[in-house]
Amino acid sequence: MSNVPAELKYSKEHEWLRKEADGTYTVGITEHAQELLGDMVFVDLPEVGATVSAGDDCAVAESVKAASDIYAPVSGEIVAVNDALSDSPELVNSEPYVGGWIFKIKASDESELESLLDATAYEALLEDE
């Protein structure tokens, strides 16, 4: 079973979301998603300053197996991207919840968080796959 940290929120598309002290949210893909994709070779990051809507594809993770869109779990403005992934995309594999984060977003509608899954619900989703 994949590691599913209890403090995070999850999308059905296997993104995770963590609220930061400054009120922004850090987004990445789950351990389960990176296991399915395999070794990362490139991550196409979104533009800082871009405005996205929940469900928009805003980044792409390319692995040895496939390219997979990464979706915005909430609407808002992209305020930072993980530039370390340009040289070290494998961080998504080795540290999916720490060094392998993909972007940070300032949510424009925090009520959208209610549609995300908690760890228990995400684990149940994984069991059904």
Curated annotation (Swiss-Prot):
The glycine cleavage system catalyzes the degradation of glycine. The H protein shuttles the methylamine group of glycine from the P protein to the T protein. It holds the Pfam family GCV_H. The lineage of its organism: Bacteria, Pseudomonadati, Pseudomonadota, Gammaproteobacteria, Enterobacterales. NCBIfam families: gcvH, PRK01202.1. Gene3D superfamilies: 2.40.50.100. It comes from Salmonella paratyphi B (strain ATCC BAA-1250 / SPB7). The modification N6-lipoyllysine is found at K65. Its cofactor is (R)-lipoate. The glycine cleavage system is composed of four proteins: P, T, L and H. Residues 24-106 form the Lipoyl-binding domain. This is Glycine cleavage system H protein. One of its GO terms (cellular component) is glycine cleavage complex. Binds 1 lipoyl cofactor covalently. Keywords: Lipoyl. Belongs to the GcvH family.
